[in-house]
Amino acid sequence: IGSVREPATSLGINVGTGGQISARTDEFHFIPGLENRPFPEGHYLLIGGGLFGGRSYAYLLSVFQQVDAQLFDGAGRDDLYDRMTGLAATIPAGSDGLRCAPFFTGSRVDPGLRASFTGLSPDNFTPGHFARALLEGMAEGFYRFGEQMAPVIGPRTTHVGAGNGVRRNRLLAAILAARFGAPLRLPALA
């Protein structure tokens, strides 16, 4: 069903405007901060839903567009997402110490939570570092949901990526794979 061929052994990671990770379980499990949804044949889908998907990357894009408009009279480019990702790809994993908690609109558990960038230094105060740190922060958020699920779902041998946020941003897919320590499968139609 959906993007996951082997639901009993897979972890689905879907990044669109928001994002979620999901895993099929054989019974209902209450884990604070996670949701259970019905799944065919008497199973359940355990969901970690974040408000930090592609919309978070769009907020950073908006900042860069405002800088362009306000400082450079709007000489901007149409491929700014690609430029951001290209710059982020030149930055080493860990963003030279810059960290992002991408909770611009809170979380499902704490709607008042807000985003932050920490570890700023003269060396990492660049557009590429901000873009990379934000993508790494998104991956970290999904990974934390996975940690919450782990006692119930056990190890999952397959990680499946879905949604435009993963399909169109291969750097994000690579960062997710690195954070989860497993290859991320990207189905053609997911």
Residue map of PLM features:
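Active-site core segments that coordinate phosphate-bearing ligands/cofactors
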Residues: 1-160, 165-190
